[in-house]
Amino acid sequence: MRYSVFLTVVVFLLAVSCQSAASTERVPNLASVQAAAAEVGKEGLLFGKHADRPVPVASITKLMTALVVVESGQDMDEWLTFEKRHVEAAANAWSRIRVGSQLRRRDVLRIALMSSENFAAYTLARTYPGGFDGFVAEMNAKAKALGMLQTRFVDPTGLSTGNVSTAADLVILARAALKHPEIREASTTGYYRAEFRKPRYSLSFGNTNALVHRDSWGVSLSKTGYLTEAGRCLVMVSEMNGTPVITVLLDSLGTRSPMGDAGRIKRWLATGQPGSVAPAAKRYAQEKNSALMAAEAEQSRTTTASSQ
């Protein structure tokens, strides 16, 4: 009798243990093709989804642009002139800012981050002591120094598909950016009215991350990005169950998909439930992942053949 009771208890404990392990091992279902999440105060990742795959990161690039600016020691109150670009702008680089007008560097940084203003990011690079090329070189040097070993930048705006990184590398970048109050404050400004001079005029800008406007999220760092090749992207630090969490989401279909993924991660951390993704977004992620895996396999075959 005692042996029978003992076996019953053992079986019950094993079942509970297996159920608990299964719930903790499950990861959230996401619309994003690549993703990672990490607690701000701890090393390592809470989870990763193709987190080491280098892909175009679009305007997430501007987080590194901001890091170079604030760590350069330049006068943040200096008036910068928006001069005509020395390189041809991409087709989607249209800006409301008038060529020849001026704005203080801290406000140029603000609209580059919160509203992803490309002319602003370009101007920050052009007015760097080493000029545009020196700025891009410093972006890459800083990435290397931080240990972002699969990251490469070719411009400060993110309009080039040559700007590539991984979800894991961008967690590192978020940690570095989070140390600077100027970046935190500028990236999470909800709305801002910039006052230009020469000529004097003003423009209103809004944050491209809808979650910034929700107090319940406690967003302390934010940057969105989009290119056709990169999909919808988001890097964010927000409160999740009382803990500041870095969320990196790369390449999803819809405008709101990254915000939806952030919500799924938040619920997963609270409940262990993986959640569900809309069929169209799920299909996009599966097709994109299959294409990337095929490209990776082809590259591996080419590399192997060339080394023989």
Task: Give short role names for the model-derived ranges.
Residues 1-4:
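Positively charged n-region of N-terminal signal peptides that target proteins for export
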Residues 6, 22, 63, 300-302:
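A detector of low-complexity, intrinsically disordered, Ser/Thr/Gly/Pro/Ala-rich segments
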Residues 6-16:
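Bacterial N-terminal signal peptides
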Residues 18-168, 172-181:
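Active-site-adjacent loops and short helices of periplasmic peptidoglycan-processing enzymes
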Residues 26-33, 105-106, 130-307:
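Penicillin-recognizing serine hydrolase domain
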